[in-house]
Curated annotation (Swiss-Prot):
CDD domains: G6S. Residues 494-522, 842-867 are annotated as: Disordered. This is Extracellular sulfatase Sulf-1. Keywords: Calcium, Endoplasmic reticulum, Glycoprotein, Golgi apparatus, Hydrolase, Metal-binding, Signal. Residues 498-513 have a biased composition (Basic and acidic residues). Ca(2+) binds at D51, D52, C87, D316, H317. One of its GO terms (molecular function) is glycosaminoglycan binding. It is found in: Endoplasmic reticulum; Golgi apparatus, Golgi stack; Cell surface. The conversion to 3-oxoalanine (also known as C-formylglycine, FGly), of a serine or cysteine residue in prokaryotes and of a cysteine residue in eukaryotes, is critical for catalytic activity.
Length: 867
């Protein structure tokens, strides 16, 4: 009995175990399938970008809807910066995740959307990576300043890109490769509303057709960039806007800062009124962006995609309005130009959280790739910020050793490009512990050989004193008489096919052509097949020789006659010494002895263009010069100097011609009676024109042989110069200052309310020497900005004590700290990839606000500085 009960118990137990095991396996299989499905549903990504939106001047204070959605519903990054305060370079960094020195877009003009950018960096934007992994990518709005709409950038399935720079009306967009012009109708053409409608319609359509495909959209607004045209319903808001009046407002001049700050004085009353109106109009344009964010949020909520969508909101750089006396603009390394708004809202983001770590525009691309589940490419300089957004997960309550988040505390701010030659020279100076430049100049000027005004034999340099009392060293210019003597004394020798040493000049030889050879030459010249040697003047400027090779023999075009006033055909004789030249002329002085040179046959290319007496442009657009220029450094230097002098002379001539042309335009006579026959329509006039045409200058005749490609290039360059000239003329002479970037503002600039009716004025916003590289550091103990300018000027601001960068305190910083800052700056200037461009924070002493110091782990490699 016991045995039967025991057997029954075992049977029931085995049945229960089998049932439990099968249910467990089924549960595991189901859980794995669900996790796999969730893994396949990747989140949507929406990047909202504004143009020129600041943080320091209070632009976010009026955007209540955006702050409610993004700040209260997501994470706020209170230390968000851009690595360059320029539109096109910053946007290029956002797309590629690279510093400016790695994508080579330094300004809004140079290389912006150029063929080099299109071939090298555009195929490696985050859009390309996402598109290749199944994301439906779409772009709406402003792309790059110089984008011309002729192509669709790679990686974008839907493309609605603005052609050229920001506008709200009267613009052109490229819709999937087709250009579409818009006018001045608010209901149909207002740019902010247009791209909002386009993006919402695309999202709805895409989810309806491809419900399981994730979407990545960029909505790139033109606001609050100029011309600051607001929607009509917002044109009366904020009449007393004053958020832009910060402690640095109209704080000028600043003699302790770099050159443009020293040059800029306090604003005039008309400038101050302009800043007030400008701030008001900028805030009005942002109201349409605020409405756009609300519409986007509501659309996502209606479609049930809000909890599966990451929304990122930021700007390409900041802005200043009146700060340090600068009426408006960007491009400065100070916080008002490099701080930007930065918010992220998404599935793993805690609402209302604040992130104190530094985030940059170069972090956008790696972050977007990380959201999509992709690794960061090694050539990207930024890092994903998702690790800063991880929620605190419950773990072992007995575990006390939690890893702290290690993040950068320093980054590079750069603007402009240094010439390589100058950069290397400065690099050598900085690393040699030499005296400052002004002290070295002072020592040199104490030497007797530099104190005379280029009067000593062989003197190459002289010291002078400028108007401010500074000593300068200038190179002595050789007088024209010395140059003429030097040219005449240069001997003409055979380039030789000698077997001894082709680089050696062995002097004169006794070689002379035989009588038979000279007879063969004369017969060749009388031959009708030699008529291609048309009579013409080979040169009109002083030179030495020009070589012609015929039947294995080398002939020289004798150009010594160039100094004569009366031009005549030049003889070409076989190469020999001067005495044999004279004998040959006496013996073989027959008329047939001279061979007339034709410039087109000198180098064997009948359609080549003679640019100088030694260089030609061949039909295949390549340049070919005499071998001497490629073999002799002296000849190369002389010819380059000659070309530079010719360019300078032609530029002066062009300037004079433009002045005469302007004079003629101003003194244009009254219109004549066109029914009468003009002088040049008469027979005499026609003959005169034909006569002039048949006696063209040799250079002009050769210029007619330029191919159509070169002519098109010149025509485009001429038109570009004319456009620049018209802009300068529109500004006026008083607003076109050398070395400065200036603008004029008048009553016609703003075409929408509120209008400007106080007349025109001129203001300068930047300078050509405003090139710099800066370190910006933010951590628990330090908050500073250190800058090196291309002029050699240094700036240092401690934001703990001077949050508005009012005073440059570089003179109070210890030399050892400056050396370390310079070394760290040089490392970041050449970094490549996120491993080099995001160094671990250096160990800083826990100093007080009076200052701290770096660990002295580096040598003093740099000692030449100027503050």
């Amino acid at each position: 009995m016991k045995t039967s009960w025991f057997a029954l118990f075992l049977a029931v137990l085995s049945t229960e175990l089998l049932t439990s095991h099968s249910s467990t396996l089924k549960s595991l299989r189901f859980r794995g399938r669900v996790q796999q499905e969730r893994k396949n549903i990747r989140p949507n990504i929406i990047l909202v970008l504004t143009d020129d939106q600041d943080v320091e001047l209070g632009s976010l204070q009026v955007m209540n809807k955006t702050r409610r959605i993004m700040e209260n519903g997501g994470a706020s990054f209170i230390n968000a910066f851009v690595t360059t305060p320029m539109c096109c370079p910053s946007r290029s960094s956002m797309l590629t995740g690279k510093y400016v020195h790695n994508h080579n877009i330094y300004t809004n003009n140079e290389n912006c959307s150029s063929p080099s950018w299109q071939a090298t960096h555009e195929p490696r934007t985050f859009a390309v990576y996402l598109n290749n992994t199944g994301y439906r990518t779409a772009f709406f709005g402003k792309y790059l300043n110089e984008y011309n709409g002729s192509y669709i950038p790679p990686g974008w399935r839907e493309w609605v890109g603005l052609v050229k720079n920001s506008r709200f009306y009267n613009y052109t967009i490229s819709r999937n490769g087709n250009k579409e012009k818009h006018g001045f109708d608010y209901a149909k053409d207002y740019f902010t509303d247009l791209i909002t409608n386009e993006s919402i319609n695309y999202f709805r359509m895409s989810k309806r057709i491809y419900p399981h495909r994730p979407i990545m959209m960029v909505i790139s607004h033109a606001a609050p960039h100029g011309p600051e045209d607001s929607a009509p319903q917002f044109s009366e808001l904020y009449p007393n806007a004053s958020q832009h009046i910060t402690p640095s407002y109209n704080y000028a001049p600043n003699m302790d800062k770099h050159w443009i700050m020293q040059y800029t004085g306090p604003m005039l009353p008309i400038h101050m009124e302009f800043t007030n109106v400008l701030q008001r109009k900028r805030l009005q344009t942002l109201m349409s962006v605020d409405d756009s964010m609300e519409r986007l949020y509501q659309m996502l909520a209606e479609m049930g995609e809000l909890e599966n969508t990451y929304i990122i909101y930021t700007a390409d750089h900041g802005y200043h309005i009146g700060q340090f006396g600068l009426v408006k603009g960007k491009s400065m390394p100070y916080d008002f130009d490099i701080r930007v708004p930065f918010f992220i809202r998404g599935p793993s983001v805690e609402p209302g959280s604040v992130v104190p770590q530094i985030v940059l525009n170069i972090d956008l691309a790696p972050t977007i790739l990380d959201i999509a589940g992709l690794d960061t490419p090694p050539d990207m300089d930024g890092k994903s910020v998702l690790k800063l957004l991880d929620l605190e997960r419950p773990g072992n309550r007995f575990r006390t050793n939690k890893k702290t988040k290690i993040w950068r505390d320093t980054f590079l701010v750069e603007r402009g490009k240094f010439l390589r030659k100058k950069e290397e020279a400065n690099k050598n100076t900085q690393q040699s512990n030499q005296l400052p430049k002004y002290e070295r100049v002072k020592e040199l000027c104490q030497q007797a050989r530099y104190q005379t005004a280029c009067e000593q034999p062989g003197q190459k340099w002289q010291c002078t004193e400028d108007a401010s009392g500074k000593l300068r060293i200038h190179k002595c210019k050789v007088s024209s008489d010395i140059l003429a003597i030097r040219k005449r004394t240069r001997s003409i020798h055979s380039r030789g096919y000698s077997g001894k040493d082709k680089d050696c000049n062995c002097g004169d030889t006794d070689f002379r052509n035989s009588r038979t050879q000279r007879k063969n030459q004369r017969q060749f010249l009388r031959n009708p097949s030699a008529q291609k040697y048309k009579p013409r003047f080979v040169h009109t400027r002083q030179t030495r020789s020009l070589s012609v090779e015929f039947e294995g023999e080398i002939y020289d075009i004798n150009l010594e006659e160039e100094e004569l006033q009366v031009l005549k055909t030049r003889s070409i004789t076989k190469r020999h010494n001067a005495e044999n030249d004279k004998k040959a002329e006496e013996t073989d002085g027959a008329p047939g002895d001279t061979m007339v040179a034709d410039g087109t046959d000198v180098i064997g290319q009948p359609s080549s263009v003679r640019v100088t007496h030694k260089c030609f442009i061949l039909p295949n657009d390549t340049i070919r010069c005499e071998r001497e220029l490629y073999q002799s450094a002296r000849a190369w230097k002389d010819h380059k100097a000659y070309i530079d002098k010719e360019i300078e002379a032609l530029q002066d001539k062009i300037k004079n011609l433009r002045e005469v042309r302007g004079h003629l335009k101003r003194r244009k006579p009254d219109e004549c009676d066109c029914t009468k026959q003009s002088y040049y329509n008469k027979e005499k006039g026609v003959k005169t024109q034909e006569k002039i045409k048949s006696h063209l200058h040799p250079f002009k005749e050769a210029a007619q042989e330029v191919d159509s490609k070169l002519q098109l290039f010149k025509e485009n360059r001429r038109r570009k110069k004319e456009r620049k000239g018209k802009k300068r003329q529109k500004k006026g002479d008083e607003c076109s200052l050398p070395g400065l970037t200036c603008f004029t503002h008048d009553n016609n600039h703003w075409q929408t309310a509120p209008f400007w009716n106080l007349g025109s004025f001129c203001a300068c916003t930047s300078s050509n020497n405003n090139t710099y590289w800066c370190l910006r550091t933010v951590n628990d103990t330090h908050n500073f900005l250190f800058c090196e300018f291309a002029t050699g000027f240094l700036e240092f601001f401690d934001m703990n004590t001077d949050p508005y960068q009012l005073t440059n305190t570089v003179h109070t910083v210890e030399r050892g700290i400056l050396n370390q800052l310079h070394v760290q700056l040089m490392e970041l200037r050449s970094c490549q990839g996120y491993k080099q461009c995001n160094p671990r924070p250096k160990g800083l002493e826990t100093g007080n606000k009076d200052g701290g110091s770096y660990d002295p782990h580096r040598g003093q490699l740099w000692d030449g500085w100027e503050g």
